[in-house]
């Protein structure tokens, strides 16, 4: 900011809110992000333009389309998919790996690939090495309160200001969490006469009857 001469307004009312919305991260923590990686992300997603609308695409029919296609192809390839079988532990022994699922018996495999968050991976490893514990515990996560609702009061008073993502910050901010609303009718093919919003960490009251 100082080197480019963009000023505090650019930092506080564009860079930090937009970045906080993208990563659901408190704005004050955005300044800890590596600047080069952040700017590369902005460039890759065409977010460095200061005029016009950003072009975004969604999958027709929603993400269920590629999930079902991937599932079909995996099954054709002979992959067994198990649902409702959460893994509770992954134990290594004598070059093999023993997996235990909730309500099931231990099963032995040659190798295991973790496709989970780092903290979940660490929790599943009772015999994690010192290096594994250090690496897997180094990543921090931000918990967020999420509400699906139909209360339009969380959106700007002027409807022409409604956007797919709406960032809100109270003048006398008391929380370190970001207040963000996704306008689902804009993001997905949901009829506009059935307004739906997803709000993270709302600092205002959402009507109970609209949740």
Give residue spans per PLM region.
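Active-site/ligand-binding neighborhood in enzyme catalytic cores
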Residues: 1-89
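Mid-domain catalytic core of redox enzymes
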Residues: 86-211
